[in-house]
Amino acid sequence: MLKKTLIASIVLAVASTSALAKELTDAKFLFDVGPYGNHSWVLKGIKDRTFEKYGINLVPIGVGPGSVKTGMALAAGKADVGYQDFSGVITVNGKSETPGLKAIFVVDDRAQDGVYALKSSGIKTWDDLDGRTVGSFPTGTTRNLIPVITTAKPSYVNMPFALRVPSLVSGKVDASEGFLTTMKFNLIKSGYPDFITLQVADKLPYAISRVITVSNAWAAANPEAVDKLRKAVKELLVEHIDDPEASVRALKGPLTMGAKGMSIEIERAKFNNAVLIMTDRVKKHGLNNSSVLAPRLDKYIDVLSEKLRLPNKHAYYEYYDLD
């Protein structure tokens, strides 16, 4: 009798699991880079099944790399959900006659773009970049926003991300573009803690950074899943802000091997939370407040579309839907 009861329980459990699996909406997921400590809440949400609780089977398939390639993958249907910089959404949609993706949740309330220089360079302000060499990328967001910030005319040296820190610390360039959550920690890990950061957000307060995106095809096929995804993201972000260490523990691999690696990723997560997510605006209005964000996003779309000389400018709702 006991054996029959156990078997019945197992069958019931399997049936329940199968039923749950049938109710889940599959979503192929791309990180822009990393994943690092600031991305770790997504992995935690997969591991602790928060996404499943909201009916989403989120499956990481890799990294862009970068926000533009992440956006291109979503627009082409190679991925369904992304974690990327909003500039990538503007760029990819602006290069297409038919927009292929949109942001559904703003994670970082401030732009992560910046310019880094060693203190020994004497660079202290944006105007100090005049005539100085800056490691950059021709289509990079920061490079195209600098003319909005200052009349200074830097001498740009084209280089990939991997060469930014080596070129800066070796003196091949006076300064280098970089994201706040990557360049800062790459310099620290390389043994160069004395540097200055010129933050784009200090001059362009309307600019934002990372968002959660969905491909238009996936959203059209799964409209209810989009709202469920927003709810899962908000729940996980609130937990991550409260306890980033719990999220970072979901990271696996060489980044978090050893006490030093884990410590750096925890600090990266805390820095991202304090500087980019929990701004005074978010403390006052809450996460992903569409009425507060919409005017800022519209202006950012206008400015970046013009500065990047994008061939197509669409209605604002083609770039984001936060509700």
Question: Residue locations for each model-derived region?
Answer:
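Sec-dependent N-terminal signal peptides
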Residues: T5-A15
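Sec/Tat signal peptide C-region and signal peptidase I cleavage site
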Residues: T17-A21
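Short, glycine-/small- and polar/acidic-enriched structural segments
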Residues: K22-P160, P166-G178, T197-L198, Y206
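Sec-exported extracytoplasmic/periplasmic mature domains
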Residues: K47, I56, A75, G94, ...
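Periplasmic-binding protein-like
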Residues: V107-A117, I188, Y192-A219, V226, ...
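Secondary-structure end/capping motifs
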Residues: A221-K307
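Hinge/cleft segment of the Venus flytrap/periplasmic-binding protein
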Residues: K299-D323
